[in-house]
Amino acid sequence: MIEMRKSGDRGTANYGWLETYHSFSFGKYYDPDNVQFGPLRVLNEDFIKGGKGFDTHPHQNMEIVTYVLSGTLEHKDSTGGEGLIKAGELQRMSAGSGISHSEKNASETEDVHLMQIWFVPEKEGIEPGYEQKEVSKGSDFFNSVITKGGGENKMDINQDITVYVGDLSSGDSGSIEISEGRLGYLHNSMIGTIQVNDLKLEPGDGLKITGPETLAITAESDSRLILFDMAP
């Protein structure tokens, strides 16, 4: 089963320095039909103005993935981790027993466009952790970048999830399966337009998927996608 989540149906807010879109209930936005999907709790698409960002704030017992689509994000946390997350890079942070961090646009003039995703963890109270990875446009249609247990060129995560990203050029096509007993969520970032089976996804559209389903995807323009294959 596939259910469309239209970009225009998302929650949105504009604070001047931050323009944000919420696929699931977040902050002042509440949608009883979109509180959570499997372990996927938050999927925000953010545009942060130059020199601005989120001051130091705490998290606990949440797996947080940040995917920077354009610009550069500066990260600092209470474990001593700090660095720059550049366009095309992902960061995975396990909040576990507790972590505080800040995220700010590293540029004074250029906006940062990013997706931030929160997953409910499999185990609570673990030691906080942090990983970062550059995603190169390889031969695979989708790159598997995060999975439980990690692996070669993959980051670990405290949940039964695999995260795929697709950096597609116009005309690229391929397919991917969500198996029976699994859930999937595909988000088409606010960059390009894609076709998935008989559905046209405009920028910001998403799909809730209950397996088994095969997704045949064609990029109608240059596009950036993220897909989660999850336990229910």
Each language-model region and where it sits:
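Short acidic-glycine-tyrosine-enriched beta hairpin
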Residues: 79-94, 137-139, 196-216
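Histidine-centered metal-chelating micro-motifs
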Residues: 53-55, 72-75, 91-92, 96-104, ...
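Tight coil/turn sites that cap or link beta-strands
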Residues: 45, 50-51, 88, 96, ...
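A short secondary-structure junction signal
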Residues: 102-104, 125-133, 154-158, 176-178
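Generic beta-strand structural signal
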Residues: 63, 83, 89, 99-101, ...
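A short glycine-rich, His/Asp/Glu-containing loop-to-beta-strand
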Residues: 14-58, 63, 114, 121, ...
